[in-house]
Amino acid sequence: MSETLTRVYLFIGPPGSGKGTLSNLLVREYGWAQLSTGNLCRKHISEQTEIGKQIDLAIKSGKLVSDSLVNAMVEQWFAEVVNQTSNIILDGYPRTVVQAQAFDAFLTKLPTPVDLWVIRFGISDQAVIERIAGRLMCQNKECQKVYSAIGQSHLAPKSPMICDACGSVLGRRNDDAGALISERLSAYHKHEQDLIDFYKKQNYRIIEINVEMPFDAVFTHFRELMRLREV
């Protein structure tokens, strides 16, 4: 275990709020570890691990991946990286109070305590819908970098529909279709306040940041709140 206390940042925000964008920048600039449950699920499926086989079966059967399976996957990942970094971002986990309770219990069993911060991304549904409508993703499963089709955006690719990082073609995510966006927002709001209430009762730090600002301003504000050095 590292000598310094590991700080865990739990990003809570709707799809399209910029959690992944901020996470990726913090990984690149500061070397933090990032957990994206979506990417981790895809990794387990592609590697045909035991967890991956169960996730794949659930998805192909049209079922939701169970909380117990998600928890097992996350706990395995966390146990592997907690000794390697002082800062860990949780992006997309926990999504429900059941998952939060399980993860909280898991943290209490670690040899050394961690410092958990809850970061709530403040953004309107309308702003989310506009962002997702212009979202592009690298189609290379090993990359999956996110871009924006809006030319003035800081996320616009240098070459139209081509990934800056790996040169693969960009496309839209299947779940970014208009009707599905509304469904995903509804699902998010169903659990959001319950999660916040849970962490308040546990006396964790909860910080809200306005992510409707330009991304550079969001990053600067986050860096100031966390007292991070400028890089």
Task: Show where each model-derived region lies.
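Glycine-rich phosphate-binding loop of ATP-dependent small-molecule kinases
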Residues: 1-231
